[in-house]
Amino acid sequence: MNKPKFVIVVGASAGGLNALSEFTAQLKPRMNAAVFIVMHLSRTSISDFLMLQLQKFTSLPCEVATDGAEIETGHIYIAPPNAHLLIKKGIIILGYGPQENRWRPSIDVLFRSAAAAYNTRAIGVILTGLLDDGTTGMLAIKRSGGTCIVQDPNDAEYPDMPLSVLKNMEVDYCISLVSMGEVIEGITLTTPEEKTAPKEVIIESQIAERVVVDYDSVSQLGEKSIFACPDCGGGLWKINKSTDGIERVDRYRCHIGHSYSENDLVIKQSEKF
C-alpha cells in the first residue's frame, strides 16, 4: 500500500459542488498526497452523488470513505452523509457521534483529526460556504504546523467560510481556485519535520472519535460556562484560547461531544425557542 506523505483536507458548503469540481480539476496526479473532502449535505443525500460528480473532473480515483480503509496516495475520499470523516495515521475512521457546528459530517472534525495525525504534513483548504464551520479546524492545523489555504472570498460564490478563517487567523495562502493545484503540488514536494500536535487538538480529536467522552477531558479544554447544551441539555465549557495566540475563536463544547462556535450556539438556541 502506497502511503501518502501529505493529507489534503477540504471543506465546502453552499456553492461547494461547482467549487469542488474546479478544485479537483486542478489537482496534479503525481502529488504525494491523499485528499479528503467534507461538503455539507442533507442526511438523506445519495452517498455516490458527489463522488460521481467529481470523478468527471479528475483522473484521480474518487470514492466514498469507508470505516477502517487504508489511505492510499492519489485517492480522493469523500465523507458520506450523516457521518463524521476522521483520519488517523494511514487509516480512515467514520464517526457517528454528536454534530459539531450543527453538522455531521463537520469540517472542523476532519481538519482537527488531520492536525492531530499529520501535523506539519496536513494541508487545510476552505472553499465557499455559509457561516463558519472549518475555522477552528483550520486553527488546529495552523497550531500543529500544517499549511492553511483559503479560497479568495472574491472568488467564492458564498464567501462566509473563507472570510471567517481570514478574520480569525493568518493563513498561508488566500488564492483563487485555479491557482490551488500548482500551490498544493509545490507544498507536497517539501519534507517538513514532523512535530506533535498540541494536547488540546489531540483531546478534541479523541472526543470526536469517541475515544474519550467524559467531564475530565472536556474540563482540560476550558472553563464551565453558564450555558446549557441546546442539543442534550448538559453543561457547556467555553474553550480556552491557546497561549500561542493562534486560537482566537469563542466556542463551546459539552462532555457528550456537541460543539458550537459562538455564532452556531446563538442560532441553535434561537431554534429551540
Language-model regions: role of each:
Residues 1-273:
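Conserved acid/base catalytic micro-environments in cytosolic active-site loops
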